Amino acid sequence: MDIADIESRSSQELHEILVNLRKEFVNLVFQKKLAQCNNISRFSLIRKSIARILTTLNKRRREEKNA
């Protein structure tokens, strides 16, 4: 997900996406441990998406707090 797509979504949608990404990340970790994961590059994509979502959510919280 790119930053423009993330910022255009509501906070509720971002929370749902965040939960799904975290579940997918955990599943990839288990697959890697069992040597069944063939798409290692997906790890970094998921981690970066999670970081972008958390950054956007924290920015919104700070803006609401300061408003």
Swiss-Prot record:
Pfam families: Ribosomal_L29. One of its GO terms (cellular component) is ribosome. One of its GO terms (biological process) is translation. One of its GO terms (molecular function) is structural constituent of ribosome. Keywords: Ribonucleoprotein, Ribosomal protein. Belongs to the universal ribosomal protein uL29 family. NCBIfam families: L29. HAMAP family: Ribosomal_uL29. This is Large ribosomal subunit protein uL29. It comes from Wolbachia pipientis wMel. The gene is rpmC.
